[in-house]
């Protein structure tokens, strides 16, 4: 898991392996971020993030599915 500077993880968030949280991203309380997920810089995550997807925006939406291992 990589959490960039300025990212804000609020409360009890479960973050999976091989996950990247971009600079200035906000992940709200009581959410799960799946394995291999990427949260783009400045995104606001308001709901659970599935495994192997990229999310971005405010509120964050899935913008692409990622192939495991890439």
Task: Name every feature range the model reports, one short phrase each.
Residues 52, 67-70:
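A glycine/serine/threonine-rich, flexible loop-to-helix segment
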């Amino acid at each position: 898991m990589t959490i960039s500077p300025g990212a804000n993880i609020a409360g009890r968030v479960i973050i999976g392996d091989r996950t990247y949280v971009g600079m200035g991203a906000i992940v709200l309380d009581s959410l799960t971020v799946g394995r291999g997920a990427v949260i783009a810089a400045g995104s606001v995550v308001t709901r659970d993030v599935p495994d192997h997807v990229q999310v971005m925006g405010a509120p964050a939406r899935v913008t692409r599915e990622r192939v495991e291992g890439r």
